[in-house]
């Protein structure tokens, strides 16, 4: 789908998922670090045609998993991710690199895949907003079960002032209306954070005048990390 515009593309909100994660480093910083090392961010989108001229420039640094749809991203806090790392349930990219340099390539590969799967499992199809009309159901994540060849699911339900999420292990997690006050004294919300990501109808963003497509996402702080039973 293309949007023909006059002059430069009209972008609307220009804040990508990466922009929004970076805006809340005390809460989303560790998740952002994992995303940055994962290869899930891109500035050029490959359509997979085999023709480089078909590639599309991103309007910013985009999430490569997005595909003209709306998504929910559940972000565990810095402390929650650090706790997983202390318990040996999740590695860091620094540790993966250290293992690789030490010749522990099998461990480095396994830990790298575990990080990637962790991130994908926290990205859900369908944007769910606190305060919207109540909705519940089973929603696909971005993580494929290699045995069934189907996407892992999350059971998510919108409540009056929260979202309840049941993961593959049966554990229930919650998105609350969490807020904090930043260094300037401004109250910031850690739920219903909106992002939109654009693709130009050209591989060169500096000369593009058309938009090819866009995707949107809503980001929430979640009270504990999701698990698919790995």
Residue ranges, per PLM feature:
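Mature, structured domains of secreted/extracytosolic soluble proteins
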Residues: 1-230
């Amino acid at each position: 789908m293309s949007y023909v515009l006059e002059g430069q593309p009209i972008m609307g909100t220009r804040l990508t998922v990466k922009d929004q994660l970076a805006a809340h480093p005390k809460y989303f910083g560790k998740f952002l670090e994992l995303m940055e090392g994962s290869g899930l961010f891109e500035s050029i989108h490959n359509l997979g045609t085999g023709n480089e001229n078909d590639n599309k420039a991103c309007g910013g640094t985009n999430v490569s998993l997005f595909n003209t749809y709306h998504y929910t991203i559940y972000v565990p806090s810095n402390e929650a991710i650090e706790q997983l790392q202390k318990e040996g349930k999740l590695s860091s990219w620094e540790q993966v690199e250290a293992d690789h340099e030490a010749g522990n390539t099998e461990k480095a590969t396994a830990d790298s895949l575990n990080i990637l799967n962790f991130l994908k499992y926290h990205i859900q199809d369908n944007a769910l907003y606190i305060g919207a009309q109540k909705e519940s159901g089973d929603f696909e994540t971005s993580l494929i079960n290699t045995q069934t060849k189907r996407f892992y699911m999350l059971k998510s339900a919108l409540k009056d002032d929260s979202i309840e999420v049941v993961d593959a292990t049966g554990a229930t997690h919650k998105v609350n209306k969490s807020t904090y006050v930043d260094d300037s004294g401004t109250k910031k919300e850690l739920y219903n954070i909106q992002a939109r990501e654009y693709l130009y109808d050209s591989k060169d963003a500096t000369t593009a005048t058309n938009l090819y497509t866009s995707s949107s996402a809503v980001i929430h702080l979640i009270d504990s990390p999701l698990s698919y039973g790995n």
